[in-house]
Structures are given as C-alpha cells and as structure tokens.
Amino acid sequence: MSELSFDAPVWRHGKALRKGYTTGSCATAAAKVAALMVLRQHLIHQVSIVTPSGVTLCLNVESPHIEGQQAIAAIRKDGGDDVDATHGMLIFARVTLNDSGEITLTGGEGIGTVTRKGVGLPLGSAAINRTPRHTIESAVREAIGPARGADVEIFAPEGEVRAQKTYNSRLGILGGISIIGTTGIVTPMSEESWKRSLSLELEIKRASGLTRVILVPGNHGERFVREQMGVDTQAVVTMSNFVGYMIEEAVRLGFCQIVLVGHPGKLIKIAAGIFHTHSHIADARMETLVAHLALLGAPLELLTLVGDCDTTEAAMEHIEAYGFGHIYNHLARRICLRVMQMRRFTKTPPVCDAILFSFDNHILGSNRPVDEIAKELQC
C-alpha cells in the first residue's frame, strides 16, 4: 500500500471514509520514540514509522517523559472512520535501556492477558500479536543499535474499560485490549477483518476441544440457546451475516456438527442459497416464503398477502392465521439441504441442523426434533 493509497478514502455506499492506523502501529511508534528519547535525552514530539504494508506514518507524540535511562511516550489511536472500540485512546510505551543486548517486551496496565489456546500466543502472555511484536522489537532495535538491550512495556490506561466493547473476553483475552494489526492500517468497515475476528473465535472453540458448534446471527440467538435449549453457550459462535464463510471455516477446522440457530428473517435466506445475509447483498425473504408456501399448497390469497409484506414478522402473522406454521420445519430442512449442497465436495461433511425461533423466543421449526439436537450438543 503506497502513501497515496493510504491518504485516498475508501468508498462505501457513496461515502468517502478515512483510513486509520492500528493499535500495533501506535505501540510501535510509542516504543520507537521512547527509545530515541532515552538515547538523545530530550523530548520528541513527532515520530515516523513504516507499517508492515509499506506506508510511512508520521504521528504526534503525547505525554513524553524522560527519567534517566527510562522514557515514556504515547500515541493516540486513530481508527479513521471505522467502527473502532479503541479509537481516540492513548497507547503508551515505557522503554528502559540496559546492557543485556536483548529486547524484552511485556504488556502492562490495560493490555489483555491470553487465557485460552487458539489466538497464536502463549497462555499467560500479553495480548500483543505476532506482527506488532515484530514491528515493536524492530523499531526499538533500530533506535538503540545492535549492542544495547531494552525492557519495553506497552500499556493503555483505558484498556480494561475499552476492552468491554470488543470480542476479547469471548476469545479468552482478559483485562484489557489487544495490540493487533497485520498491515498497520485500519480500513474502514473492513469486512475481511470482521470475518477474521469471528473465525478466530471458532478456532479458539476448536482448540479447547469442542467438536460441535452453534452458529447464530447475533445476541438474540445466543440467548435463545441458553434459555430455550438448555445448552451451554460455550458452543455458540456469532456468524453475523457471513453464513457461508463461517460454515466453511467450521468445516476447515474439523467440526463434526454445525447447528444454525436464528430468526427466520435471517435464516430463510439460506433456504434460497443466499449465504451472505446482509440486505445490501440480497433479500428474497418474501420470494422464498412465497415459493415454499406454494410448494406446500398454500392458497393464492396467502401467497399474495405474504408477497406484499415488508417484514418477516408481518408475513409470519399471515402464515399463522392460515395455519401454515409447518412451513418452518420445511424451511429448516431446506436450509440444511442448501448447506450440504454447498459442502458437497467435502470428504467428511459435518452434520447440519437448523432451528428457527420467533422474536419472543418460541421455537418455530427445525429439521429434526430440537430435543434430539440439544442432546447431541451436550455430548
């Protein structure tokens, strides 16, 4: 990525969105400038780094402080126009020079601790991912030269509070934020980074020994699993709109059973072969309902009423009034068929189940008895 491409906005739905930089870039810049300040023994108010993607960032330094062979500096996180829980917070580095010739990197206040396998870091270590670890150590080494050593501590006073708005606790990263970023640059509304964060949760579940997974669109699905199915939500992973991607990831990781649980407003799209359920990709909810109601022999009057509906909930009222509630079992079976068709070239495809529920947490339908599915999930 060139500097020009970094400055150029990202266009989403007709809007120009500004790029930002990662917590990894902030930590790298803070560590570099702190090391330079110790060596030069004067405050520095601006520092430049080259990100892993090749972009040169020139960043303002905040709270610089020198005390003997130790210096502290902070860089303010700028997530651009991305939805970013860490935007605006200060990422600090404390660098203490020594004669060991080695650079040691630790996480301090507000940096999470790894408590589960699956994130690519040792248990008990600071949640500073591999790429930022490398860039931090390289930047400090460049500053201090080949002979000196340094103790580098990354900390973020707001980290514990900000982390509550992230997926960290679900990933087993407790007590603070993660220092992340493979490119050093934040791309606004990056679908790929979102998908990767969801996939990472799948990896952690698999690493913990789970072989069966429940994929839900969001929090409502997790609540339904807990309250109505009596199943431990440890097996639940959010898939958001990325149904196809998350199924492929679950297959890649070797899960033997995938259970899709959600409201018909999302899941019926899968019955039509739509594996990205965001409305800007495809809708077809009413068309799918009308087609399958027709297959079940529904009268033209019901088909017309459903076809004219704007919401799934409105369509469901008509379906109930006409006594066609059995369509949900039919749709659940169709969803599973579509999933199996998608994975037809997999050597050992997982068992697929689907459960549809209403907004008031009632089971609408499933491909087979829910009790049977729940029992298998508890094995």
Curated annotation (Swiss-Prot):
One molecular function GO term is: cobalt-precorrin-5B C1-methyltransferase activity
Q: Which UniProt keywords apply?
A: Cobalamin biosynthesis, Methyltransferase, S-adenosyl-L-methionine, Transferase
Q: Does the keyword S-adenosyl-L-methionine apply?
A: yes
NCBIfam families, per this entry?
Answer: cbiD (TIGR00312)
Q: Which family does it belong to?
A: Belongs to the CbiD family.
Q: What class of enzyme is it?
A: transferase
**Which reactions fall under this protein's catalytic activity?**
Co-precorrin-5B + S-adenosyl-L-methionine = Co-precorrin-6A + S-adenosyl-L-homocysteine
What HAMAP family does the database record attribute to this sequence? CbiD (MF_00787)
Which residues are connected by disulfide bridges in this protein?
Answer: none
Give the encoding gene's name: cbiD
- Matches recorded under Pfam families: CbiD (PF01888)
Tell me one GO biological process term: methylation
Which superkingdom is the protein from?
Bacteria
Pathway annotation from the record: Cofactor biosynthesis; adenosylcobalamin biosynthesis; cob(II)yrinate a,c-diamide from sirohydrochlorin (anaerobic route): step 6/10
Enzyme Commission number, as recorded: 2.1.1.195
Q: Which residues are the signal sequence here? A: none
* NADP in keyword set: no
Q: Which SUPFAM superfamilies match?
A: CbiD-like
State the name under which the record lists this protein: Cobalt-precorrin-5B C(1)-methyltransferase
